[in-house]
């Protein structure tokens, strides 16, 4: 079994961003087609619930809101069995992008707007149908017993690199107060990979050292053969200097 060596990397932690979610004054909701549909000063769960159709009630006198929809409503009549087969008149407003019904009013100039059930999502890409199915499955089956959590255990996750091989990343998070935390991640690699990389680096370093030594001596590897030939030739005779010369 190959040995595992860890090395540290720099990473960012998004845990602190969740601390400021409650301080946001406005909440943005989107249609199922990811088109922005509602800006509200509170969450939809805080609005009154209409039990007849599970719609949320927005009163313009109590909550600041901005609705985005098709300005031309569609008038429909609904028969309510719970109210003695009464007829309810609705002016339904659709999404500008996908024409999905989002809101309805009992009169076009009313200050009370009803948000239809599961028509809006908080984040783009959410699927309310999947959430409903998951909630029903959780309600019908008993949840398994939770495993005891380890207090000091690291959080392990996997990252797939460019070669398609999974690299294990271990994250250690340390809380530094209410609004601060430090996360240190380590990547676990096999010792064979690290050894191969070190050998390649050592070969490159040795080649650079040899080249520098040859440059100091006066040439490169290609000049060694030429230098040996020049060294074999006899040195030139020195010119004699002076006024008294023997003849």
Swiss-Prot record:
Alphabetic keyword roster: Coiled coil, Phosphoprotein
InterPro entries per UniProt: STEEP-like
Organism superkingdom: Eukaryota
Chain's gene name: Steep1
Coiled coil: 195-216
Role, per record: Molecular adapter that stimulates membrane curvature formation and subsequent endoplasmic reticulum exit site (ERES) establishment by recruiting PI3K complex I, leading to COPII vesicle-mediated transport.
Region feature (Disordered): 215-247
Residues that bear Phosphoserine: 127
Full protein name: STING ER exit protein
GO biological process, one term: mRNA splicing, via spliceosome
Family: Belongs to the STEEP1 family.
GO annotations of cellular component type: catalytic step 2 spliceosome; cytoplasm
Keyword Transport: no
């Amino acid at each position: 079994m190959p040995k595992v060596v860890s090395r540290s990397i720099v990473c960012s932690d998004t845990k602190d961003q969740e601390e400021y979610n409650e301080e946001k004054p406005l909440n943005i909701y989107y249609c199922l087609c990811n088109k922005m549909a509602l800006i509200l000063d509170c969450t939809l769960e805080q609005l009154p619930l209409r039990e007849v159709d599970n719609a949320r009630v927005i009163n313009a006198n109590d909550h600041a809101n901005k609705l985005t929809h098709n300005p031309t409503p569609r008038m429909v009549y609904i028969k309510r069995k719970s109210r003695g087969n009464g007829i309810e008149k609705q002016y339904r407003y659709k999404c500008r992008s996908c024409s999905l019904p989002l809101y309805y009013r009992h009169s076009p100039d009313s200050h009370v707007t009803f948000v239809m059930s599961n028509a809006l999502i908080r984040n783009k890409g959410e699927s309310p149908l999947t959430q409903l199915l998951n909630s029903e499955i959780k309600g019908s089956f008993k949840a398994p017993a939770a495993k005891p959590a380890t207090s000091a255990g690291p959080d392990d996750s996997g990252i797939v690199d460019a070669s398609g091989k999974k690299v294990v990343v271990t994250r250690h998070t340390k809380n530094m107060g209410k609004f601060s935390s430090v996360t240190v991640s380590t990547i676990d690699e096999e010792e064979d990979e690290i050894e191969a990389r070190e050998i390649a680096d050592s070969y490159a370093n040795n080649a650079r050292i040899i080249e520098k030594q040859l440059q100091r001596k006066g040439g490169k590897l290609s000049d060694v053969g030429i230098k040996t030939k020049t060294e074999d030739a006899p040195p030139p005779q020195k010119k004699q200097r002076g006024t008294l010369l023997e003849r």
